[in-house]
């Protein structure tokens, strides 16, 4: 959550510092991508596999299989 606040603060600072403010959505996009990559890297190998399976299924329009854990 702290990283999310950091991204928001940095985006606001860049929005104020950039003389031509028409590029602030591009900066926001890159900060969000960095945040997603950071969160992905925190996952272990099994969670990464499930993450990509879920993402690819959603992007291709196929129904997402329900994962049932019998722990």
Curated annotation (Swiss-Prot):
It is a single-pass membrane protein. The keyword Transmembrane applies. Keywords: Glycoprotein, Host membrane, Membrane, Transmembrane, Transmembrane helix. It comes from the Viruses. Residues 39-69 are extracellular. Glycans are attached at residue 53. It is found in: Host membrane. One of its GO terms (cellular component) is membrane. The chain crosses the membrane at residues 17-38. Residues 1-16 are cytoplasmic. Belongs to the asfivirus X69R family. This is Uncharacterized membrane protein X69R. It comes from African swine fever virus (isolate Pig/Kenya/KEN-50/1950).
């Amino acid at each position: 959550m702290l990283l999310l606040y950091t991204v928001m603060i940095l985006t606001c600072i860049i929005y104020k510092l950039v003389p031509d403010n028409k590029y602030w959505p591009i900066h926001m996009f890159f900060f969000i991508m960095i945040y997603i990559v950071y969160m992905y890297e925190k996952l272990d190998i099994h969670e990464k596999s499930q993450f990509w399976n879920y993402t690819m299924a959603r992007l291709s329009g196929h129904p997402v299989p329900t994962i049932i854990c019998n722990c």
